[in-house]
């Protein structure tokens, strides 16, 4: 290997500087330099260097060659021009050339001497021989011939020739042999290592160099590669500033996870020693961490340095999803090196350079589409890894960009190696970024350093990059899509090779996008606090209204429980509003933005949102069950206004005679009204099956589910061969909720505007049926509050034939009879009622007798059967409620009034029915609140939340649709069945007639 020019002068300067002085200098001035410098520089490639320039593999830029020199074949060094011989060569461009005399225009193959050629010269100015001839330039002992002949190689001074590996020519021996021993032999006390010869003194401090390869617990071993090449690479880098050796030393440090321990002199320890003792050399591109001749491996080891690197300088490139200036491509490039430190090439990361999992090129390249969250996981056989990666390739990753003057630059991409140990501590696994040590160079697979004793055998251990994550952080408050330098987080795993054909390893590659969501969290907390406070007030008002409706002024345990139930419902609405609002915000602003200003929360940040959705569902379920229980326990009674039409003769059993009796009133009208009431108990303003199927159609068939993908596209369709990004829980919830609400609201509007008006309105039809049947409905949803449907026929009776019925309808249509309202000359048939305690007590006394048919027989009169007692109680209740409506009981009278607007808004009554009950005119059919019909908002939101919770848990819209419809039918069945039993119990209608 060769040496760098001026090495002797550099070593003289370095010897004057102590390690402590250098360290103090760095600690004093490095923070100031860091604040002033940037980590970007011009992007240059080897093929763009001029013929008289070479590509400096350390500085990654084109550097001029010396006099009488040109670029070599690889472009990374210099050679003499044709007709010039080398008189000095220490590696790289540091060579000296001298023109050959006229009588010896040819140059030897090694370029060190001039020679007379027996025939023509090649383009390189060397002798040319016919096919089948061997060019011999020196005699057998190495003496240069005036004309090419075959001679023995001469290893003495002035020749220093040895036989090459192929044995077909004599070549000059390795320069370190000449410099160290002035011969081609490396005899004691000199040290022969890695094919190089070094002096036994003056290279490194007298400390034992460790060839240990650090790994996971219990996986450390002595690497044959380190044992063979570590010392030689370090010595060549230190003594001769050899660029390739310095790169090879850096590679060994990277293979050792960039870990170093002050107690040992391992690969990174040697690198740090050279770095600290070359402080007198200039930096590369004004980057203080990048020393001339050395690779850039570290960002320094000062606490708090990592956050500055990651957030001090933003990329001037603007990223946008849409518009004329659309820019959604992250242009990553990498300088690649082989294990021996040779520069291979510049290459883009497209095509799966850093992705071990195989896939199509389109899907692999999707990882670098800005705004697309990327996840790739697979399991790879160890045997395939050993075949595909016999030696590691090392990458220095950069992000390419163009400034405002259209000049190309590259920005260094820092690396967070989770396996890095600093003094045996995994500092990069700490949650505090201030303790991180950022690095630069990475590799994917190392199957070399894990070989023991022989490099030709199968490795005992291989090291694989099992987790690679590229995170892009958006600059806060940006409106132009500016980002900070991306961060590569990488984790390696050591695999102990036992049977390569049966072993495998799981690997993953991901790209995530982050932004500071602190402000969003604060705003969410503020909204939750404000709306939660309003929910408390609303719940207090509902509780106060409930207390009035049950006629109890005392605050007891039941009151507290009721308040908590009301608060659960209101708080569910708060969580629902916040989650839907948050979801729609991210859906609209992320998918519709042009210049990028917001990025989606990461999955771990979505946990809080999912918790809110879960709370909304749990609380809404409690509210739904509370309403369900309230509906199936209401008091209801059908008041039959029909009166007997006359008397008939009736035989008296046991007396052998007859007597006159009133004509009994038919019960069929009551049964009919009861059946209609039973049918409308679960009538809704939407069609549940249509709702579920329509939502599913838009999600799965139309493709609205694609809006929930974590990418920048707002298209409803995706190309199957292309990469499909993972779903965002927030976007998935937002799309589902928006569709469910939109379709539900459309159904409700259609139901109210068209269906009820032109086709069928079951609620109003029920009120009309009551009038035609001459039956009123008395409902008590609370102890002292309920509803009254006035169904008293304006014709006096309803138990008639078809002809008379049609005649009555005709008279009513022609306004030839009075109006149906409770108050004369009005149409008001529905009322909200607040009854007095005295009225309720009287009702309860009769009702207690009515329900005694379910009690023990010993409590009943011995002279009457249970059935007769119930019939008697039924007629008593019918008579009492009829007389109450007719103002017969002055001590239990009532008056009719309109509700105040504020009373309607607050849902409570300001007046207490102390002596008289109060009937409030109700044109809105409020009695539907004891039915499904009047609670559509609660049912719609409950179904929506159920659908979303199932989907978030299973990530399956089809399953969520099926389970949602199933629960709707289950609760509908429960409501029908239990409500029917309650109706039969409270009205004495035999359940067998409720069909």
Swiss-Prot record:
Please report the record's description of how this protein sits within the membrane. Answer: Multi-pass membrane protein
SS bond list: 49-62, 65-78, 80-97, 100-114, 117-127, 129-150, 153-170, 173-184, 186-197, 237-246, 253-268, 357-378
* Location in or out of the cell: Cell membrane; Endoplasmic reticulum membrane; Cell projection, Cilium; Cytoplasm, Cytoskeleton, Cilium basal body
Q: What is the effect of changing residue 513 to C?
A: In JBTS6, MKS3 and COACH1
Signal peptide span? 1-36
- Intramembrane extents: 671-679, 680-688, 689-701, 732-757, 758-762, 763-771, 927-929, 930-936, 937-952
Q: In which tissues is it expressed?
A: Widely expressed in adult and fetal tissues. Expressed at higher level in spinal cord.
Q: Which UniProt keywords apply?
A: Bardet-Biedl syndrome, Cell membrane, Cell projection, Ciliopathy, Cilium, Cilium biogenesis/degradation, Coiled coil, Cytoplasm, Cytoskeleton, Deafness, Disease variant, Disulfide bond, Endoplasmic reticulum, Glycoprotein, Intellectual disability, Joubert syndrome, Meckel syndrome, Membrane, Nephronophthisis, Obesity, Retinitis pigmentosa, Signal, Transmembrane, Transmembrane helix
Q: Give the result of residue 176 to I, as annotated.
A: Does not affect function in non-canonical Wnt signaling activation. When expressed in TMEM67-null cells it induces ROR2 phosphorylation upon stimulation by WNT5A
Q: In UniProt terms, what is the effect of altering residue 359 to E?
A: Does not affect Wnt signaling regulation; when expressed in TMEM67-null cells it induces ROR2 phosphorylation upon stimulation by WNT5A
Q: Which biological process terms from the Gene Ontology are attached to this UniProt entry? A: cilium assembly; ERAD pathway; negative regulation of centrosome duplication; non-canonical Wnt signaling pathway
Question: Is tRNA processing tagged as a keyword?
Answer: no
> Reported effect of changing residue 376 to P?
In MKS3; leads to endoplasmic reticulum retention and prevents localization at the cell membrane; decreased function in non-canonical Wnt signaling activation; when expressed in TMEM67-null cells does not induce ROR2 phosphorylation upon stimulation by WNT5A; loss of interaction with WNT5A
Q: What is the effect of changing residue 549 to C?
A: In MKS3; affects Wnt signaling regulation; when expressed in TMEM67-null cells does not rescue increased canonical Wnt signaling
Q: What disease is this protein tied to?
A: TMEM67 mutations result in ciliary dysfunction leading to a broad spectrum of disorders, collectively termed ciliopathies. Overlapping clinical features include retinal degeneration, renal cystic disease, skeletal abnormalities, fibrosis of various organ, and a complex range of anatomical and functional defects of the central and peripheral nervous system. The ciliopathy range of diseases includes Meckel-Gruber syndrome, Bardet-Biedl syndrome, Joubert syndrome, and nephronophtisis among others.
Protein name, UniProt field:
Meckelin
Give the organism, scientific name: Homo sapiens
What's the gene? TMEM67
């Amino acid at each position: 290997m060769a040496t760098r020019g001026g090495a002797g002068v550099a070593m003289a300067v370095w010897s004057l500087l102590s390690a402590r002085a250098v360290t103090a200098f760095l600690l004093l001035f490095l923070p100031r330099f860091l604040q002033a410098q940037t980590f970007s520089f011009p992007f240059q490639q080897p093929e763009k260097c001029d013929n008289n320039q070479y590509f400096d593999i350390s500085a990654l830029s084109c550097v001029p060659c010396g006099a009488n020199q040109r670029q070599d074949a690889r472009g990374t060094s210099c050679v003499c021009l044709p007709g010039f011989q080398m008189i000095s060569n220490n590696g790289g461009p540091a060579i000296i050339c001298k023109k050959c005399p006229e009588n010896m225009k040819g140059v030897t193959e090694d370029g060190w001497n001039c020679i007379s050629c027996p025939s023509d010269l090649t383009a390189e100015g060397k002798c040319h021989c016919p096919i089948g001839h061997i060019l011999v330039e020196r005699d057998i002992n190495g003496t240069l011939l005036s004309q090419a002949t075959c001679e023995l190689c001469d290893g003495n001074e002035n020749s220093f020739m040895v036989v090459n590996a192929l044995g077909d020519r004599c070549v000059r021996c390795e320069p370190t042999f000449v410099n160290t021993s002035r011969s081609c032999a490396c005899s004691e006390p000199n040290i022969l290592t890695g094919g190089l010869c070094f002096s036994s003194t003056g290279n490194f401090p007298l400390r034992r160099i460790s060839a240990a390869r650090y790994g996971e617990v219990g996986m450390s071993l002595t690497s044959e590669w380190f044992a063979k090449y570590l010392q030689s690479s370090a010595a060549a880098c230190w003594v001769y500033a050899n660029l390739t050796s310095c790169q090879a030393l850096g590679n060994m440090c990277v293979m050792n996870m960039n870990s170093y321990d002050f107690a040992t002199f391992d690969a990174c320890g040697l690198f740090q020693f050279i770095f600290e003792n070359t402080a007198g050399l200039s930096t590369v591109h004004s980057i203080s961490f990048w020393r001339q001749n050395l690779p850039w491996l570290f960002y320094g080891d000062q606490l708090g340095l990592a956050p500055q690197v990651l957030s001090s300088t933003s990329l001037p490139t603007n990223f946008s999803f849409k518009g004329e200036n659309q820019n959604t491509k992250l242009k990553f490039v990498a300088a690649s090196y082989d294990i021996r430190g040779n520069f291979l090439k510049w290459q883009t990361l497209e095509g799966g350079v850093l992705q071990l999992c195989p896939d199509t090129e389109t899907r692999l390249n999707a990882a670098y589409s800005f705004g697309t969250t990327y996840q790739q996981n697979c399991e790879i056989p160890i045997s395939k890894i050993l075949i595909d990666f016999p030696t590691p390739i090392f990458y220095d990753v950069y992000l390419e960009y163009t400034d405002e003057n259209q000049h190309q630059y590259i920005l260094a991409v820092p690396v967070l190696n989770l396996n890095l140990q600093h003094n045996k501590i995994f500092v990069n696994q700490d949650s505090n970024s201030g303790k991180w040590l950022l690095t630069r160079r990475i590799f994917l697979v190392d199957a070399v350093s894990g070989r023991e004793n022989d490099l030709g055998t199968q490795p005992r251990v291989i090291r694989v990059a099992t987790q690679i994550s590229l995170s892009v952080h958006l600059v806060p408050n940006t409106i132009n899509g500016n980002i900070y330098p991306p961060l590569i987080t990488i984790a390696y795993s050591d695999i102990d090779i036992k049977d390569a054909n049966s072993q495998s390893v799981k690997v993953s590659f991901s790209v995530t996008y982050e932004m500071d969501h602190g402000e969003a969290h604060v705003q969410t907390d503020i909204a939750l606090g404000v709306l939660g406070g309003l929910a408390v007030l609303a719940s207090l008002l509902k509780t106060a209204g409930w207390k009035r409706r049950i006629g109890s002024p005392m605050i007891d345990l039941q009151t507290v429980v009721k308040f908590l139930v009301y608060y659960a419902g209101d708080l569910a609405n708060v969580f629902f509003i916040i989650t839907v609002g948050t979801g729609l915000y991210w859906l609209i602003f992320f998918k519709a933005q042009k210049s990028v200003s917001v990025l989606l929360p990461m999955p771990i940040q979505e946990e809080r949102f999912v918790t809110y959705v879960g709370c909304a569902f749990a609380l809404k379920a409690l509210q739904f069950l509370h309403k369900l229980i309230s509906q199936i326990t209401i008091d209801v009674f059908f008041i039959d206004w029909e009166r007997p039409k006359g008397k008939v003769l009736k035989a008296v059993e046991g007396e052998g005679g007859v007597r006159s009796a009133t004509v009994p009133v038919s019960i069929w009208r009551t049964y009919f009204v009861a059946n209609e009431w039973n049918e409308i108990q679960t009538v809704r303003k939407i069609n549940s099956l249509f709702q579920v199927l329509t939502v599913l159609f838009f999600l799965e068939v139309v493709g609205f589910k694609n809006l929930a993908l974590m990418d920048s596209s707002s298209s409803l369709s995706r190309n199957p061969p292309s990469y499909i990004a993972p779903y965002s829980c927030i976007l998935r919830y937002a799309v589902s909720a928006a569709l469910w609400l939109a379709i539900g609201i459309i159904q409700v509007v259609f139901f109210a505007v068209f269906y009820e008006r032109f086709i069928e309105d079951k609620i109003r039809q029920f009120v009309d049926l009551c009038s035609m049947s001459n039956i009123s409905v008395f409902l008590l949803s609370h102890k002292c509050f309920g509803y009254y449907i006035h169904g008293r026929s304006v014709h006096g009776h309803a138990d008639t034939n078809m002809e008379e019925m049609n005649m009555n309808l005709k008279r009513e249509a022609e306004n030839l009879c009075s109006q149906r309202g409770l108050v004369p000359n009005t149409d008001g048939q529905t009322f909200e009622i607040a009854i007095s305690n005295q009225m309720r007590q009287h009702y309860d006394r009769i009702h207690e007798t009515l329900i005694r048919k379910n009690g023990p027989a010993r409590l009943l009169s011995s002279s009457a059967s249970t059935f007769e007692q119930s019939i008697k109680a039924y007629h008593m209740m019918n008579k009492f409620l009829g007389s109450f409506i007719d103002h017969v009981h002055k001590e239990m009278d009532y008056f009719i009034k309109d509700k105040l607007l504020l009373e309607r808004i607050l849902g409570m009554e300001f007046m207490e029915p102390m002596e008289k009950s109060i009937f409030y005119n109700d044109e809105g059919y409020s009695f539907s609140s004891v039915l499904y019909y009047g609670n559509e908002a609660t049912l719609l939101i409950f179904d929506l939340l159920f659908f979303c919770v199932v989907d978030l848990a299973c990530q399956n819209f089809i399953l969520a649709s099926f389970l949602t419809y199933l629960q709707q039918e289950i609760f509908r069945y429960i409501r029908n069945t239990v409500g029917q039993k309650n109706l039969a119990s409270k009205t004495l209608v035999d359940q067998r007639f409720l069909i």
